[in-house]
From Swiss-Prot:
Residues annotated as transmembrane: 32-54
Gene coding for it: SERAC1
Name assigned to this protein: Protein SERAC1
Tissue specificity comment: Widely expressed, with predominant expression in skeletal muscle and brain. In the brain, highest levels are found in the frontal and occipital cortices, cerebellum and hippocampus.
The entry's keywords: Deafness, Disease variant, Endoplasmic reticulum, Lipid biosynthesis, Lipid metabolism, Membrane, Mitochondrion, Phospholipid biosynthesis, Phospholipid metabolism, Transmembrane, Transmembrane helix
Associated clinical condition: 3-methylglutaconic aciduria with deafness, encephalopathy, and Leigh-like syndrome: An autosomal recessive disorder characterized by childhood onset of delayed psychomotor development or psychomotor regression, sensorineural deafness, spasticity or dystonia, and increased excretion of 3-methylglutaconic acid. Brain imaging shows cerebral and cerebellar atrophy as well as lesions in the basal ganglia reminiscent of Leigh syndrome.
Recorded GO CC terms: endoplasmic reticulum; endoplasmic reticulum membrane; extracellular matrix; mitochondria-associated endoplasmic reticulum membrane contact site; mitochondrial outer membrane; mitochondrion
Organism: Homo sapiens
Any one Gene Ontology BP term: phosphatidylglycerol acyl-chain remodeling
Keyword Transport: no
Membrane topology qualifier: Single-pass membrane protein
Keyword Transmembrane helix: yes
Length: 654
């Protein structure tokens, strides 16, 4: 028993002792008083000395803490004293009880005040170091979903913590919380630890060889001809022969090339790019995703992602693979452990719309707390890309045309002035995707989706089966992907350019024959056609390169003037639309488009763009710019916005 405790006991005995007899004080009692008083004074002095030394030890500054704050990947561990002697005594017990009382006060304030973790409290040194941090962590692991979401929201809105407090969250939170933070717009990037170190490459190996081995490890049987072609080409050929054979014919996912201005260009390719394109197609098969994960594909793709920071096309293909793998929920833990959530959280904040949209697709497929839909390859949500409290009341879908892309087709019309004049107001700045930049701001209650599909102008040395490129095949594939994304659950407006309008018509006809797709028909409120060749186009007859003239692709053949397939589609759609309650708006170009350097072609004349129903509006632009407004207050955009609001008026009011 400590001396201080002995003094307290002695004092208690004196206080509870009976009154002395009135006969007087005996010398023995006097000696006892002196003994007890001396003990009390001595014990008190020792107690005060101990407390002073303990206080001095507690307030001693560890100069290494400053260095630890600079290390973003530093692991903060709550240390426990190994000296059991420090865990005894009245002083230790008193401090422990005091700390418990402080925690109770803070916990009570958390219930009374909505924002209890102000800066003065964020640095309170208590037994668990940071009460605010651990209270939020506890809430984030609650069995109640609403409580979990509220905890993530509070974390994302916290910006006054120190580095180590964010690191505590990063190390202690579960995958659901980490994904939720990545999908919260205001989240601090300090919530995300650096990805774990990548395994070293094997001796005398390279990323190219590792990619080959990964591709060779994937199943090679029961594959369609496109996957077989890419796989065999990537495994057997050199970089030089690949560049010669690619010939510009492959455009999986769309590379954003101008519509017809690059007919004669032959882009170069590398073994890595061909391996990636093959792996993208393999990753659309669930069992192949398991093989990719088991063979270290997540780490290898991350290495490649880091090596090609200056090559957006390589990074986009890698993100397509990760996004496809994220469709399989049993792979989510592996994706999180490999560090991809941290990488995508940073990519979400990129000013480049394509990069942020690919990252948004990955995180949406990982987020099963707030997202029920699954976004398959080629389906990108432009708005909302983060978690939001804004109720989504309708969908607007953008379908590009031949040789188009999900983002670049819908960019603002190119302007030299926009490039030269950098200091502009936000409303006047050039946008690479006006649906995301303009429409999302004007109609925040919309979910805006843009789809991407592969197209080509020629079948020159093509190896894929012809039916894969037909309008019927593409429309069926797109309809399946859009339904998986929840299209049809809300009111829908379709916006299409060129061949994309033919796909929209075919998708609606397909949906009308399938009972499980009936909601797509019932919820369609309107369709906008930008220069859609309802009656065909002469594009295939005006190719600059002779091989395109001799071997036009199937989609080009189907776009030919007076095509039987096109006529059947037109007649069937008009019959289908007779008793349907949706609005139609047609825009048509009036200016020719330069095909190459010498030939101008009116790709879709007025008579071909006339659907036969809905308004037909001629616009003084060419085929490329019919879907690219010059600025936000231009007629093209304002009329489009007006149509969307009118078609969805009742739905947006509710």
């Amino acid at each position: 028993m400590s001396l201080a405790a002995y003094c307290v006991i002695c004092c208690r005995r004196i206080g509870t002792s009976t009154s002395p007899p009135k006969s007087g004080t005996h010398w023995r009692d006097i000696r006892n008083i002196i003994k007890f008083t001396g003990s009390l004074i001595l014990g008190g002095s020792l107690f005060l000395t101990y407390e002073v030394l303990a206080l001095k030890k507690a307030v001693t500054l560890d100069t290494q803490v400053v260095e630890r704050e600079k290390m973003k990947s530093y692991i903060y561990v709550h240390t426990v004293s190994l000296d059991k002697g420090e865990n005894h005594g009245i002083a230790w017990q008193a401090r422990k009880e005091l700390h418990k009382a402080v925690r109770k006060v803070l916990a009570t304030s958390a219930k009374i005040l909505r924002n209890p973790f102000a800066d003065p409290f964020s640095t309170v040194d208590i037994e668990d170091h940071e009460c605010a941090v651990w209270l939020l962590l506890r809430k984030s692991k609650s069995d109640d979903k609403t409580t979990r979401l509220e905890a993530v929201r509070e974390m994302s809105e916290t910006h006054h913590w120190h580095d180590y407090q964010y690191r505590i969250i990063a190390q202690a939170c579960d995958p659901k919380t980490l994904i939720g933070l990545a999908r919260s717009e205001e989240s601090d990037l300090r919530f995300f630890l650096l990805p774990p170190p990548l395994p070293s490459l094997k001796e005398d190996s390279s990323t190219e060889e590792e990619l080959r081995q990964l591709l060779a490890s994937l199943p090679q049987t029961e594959l369609d001809e496109c996957i077989q072609y890419f796989t065999s080409l990537a495994l057997s050929e050199s970089s030089q022969s690949l560049a010669a054979q690619k010939g510009g014919l492959w455009c999986f996912g769309g590379n954003g090339l101008p519509y017809a201005e690059s007919f004669g260009e032959v882009p170069s390719a590398t073994v890595e790019m061909f391996c990636l394109e093959a792996i993208v197609k393999h990753s659309e098969i669930s069992t192949h995703c398991d093989k990719i994960e088991a063979n270290g594909g997540l780490q290898l793709l991350q290495r490649l992602y880091r090596l090609h920071k200056d090559c957006p096309k390589v990074q986009r293909n890698i993100m397509r693979v990760i996004g496809n793998m994220a469709l399989n929920e049993h792979l989510h833990s592996s994706i999180v452990r490999s560090g991809w959530v941290s990488i995508m959280a940073e990519a979400m904040k990129s000013p480049h719309i394509m990069e942020s949209s690919h990252a948004a697709r990955i995180l949406a497929n990982l987020d099963r707390e707030t997202v029920q839909e699954k976004y398959q390859d080629g389906v990108y949500v432009l708005h909302p890309q983060y978690r939001t409290s804004q109720p989504i009341k309708a969908d607007v879908l953008f379908i590009h045309g031949l040789m188009g892309a999900a983002f670049k087709t819908w960019r603002q019309q190119d302007s030299e002035q926009a490039v030269i004049e950098k200091p502009m107001e936000d409303e006047d700045r050039y946008t690479t995707c006006w649906p995301k930049t303009w429409l999302a701001k004007d109609c925040p209650a919309l979910r805006i989706i843009s789809v991407e599909y592969d197209t080509s102008l020629s079948d020159w040395r093509a190896r894929c089966p012809m039916e894969r490129k037909s309008i019927a095949f593409r429309s069926n594939e797109l309809l399946r992907k859009l339904r998986a994304a929840g299209v049809g659950d809300r009111p829908v407006v379709w916006i299409s350019h060129s061949m994309g309008g033919l796909l929209v018509k075919k998708m609606l006809l397909e949906a009308s024959t399938k009972p499980e797709m009936s909601t797509v028909i019932n919820n369609t409120r309107g369709i906008i056609f930008y220069s859609v060749p309802h009656h065909g186009s002469r594009l295939a007859e005006y190719s600059v390169n002779i091989r395109y003239l001799l071997f036009p692709s199937l989609e080009v053949k189907e776009l030919s003037k007076d095509s039987p397939a096109l006529k059947t589609l037109q007649d069937d759609f008009l019959e289908f639309a007779k008793d349907k309650n949706f609005q139609v708006l047609n825009f048509v170009e009036t200016l020719p488009t330069y095909i190459g350097s010498m030939i101008k072609l009116h790709v879709v004349p007025v008579e071909s763009a006339d659907l036969g129903i809905g308004d037909l509006i001629p616009v003084d632009v060419n085929h490329l710019n019919i879907c690219k407004p010059k600025k936000k207050d231009a007629f093209l955009y304002q009329r489009t916005l007006q149509f969307i609001r009118e078609a969805l008026a009742k739905d947006l009011e509710n």
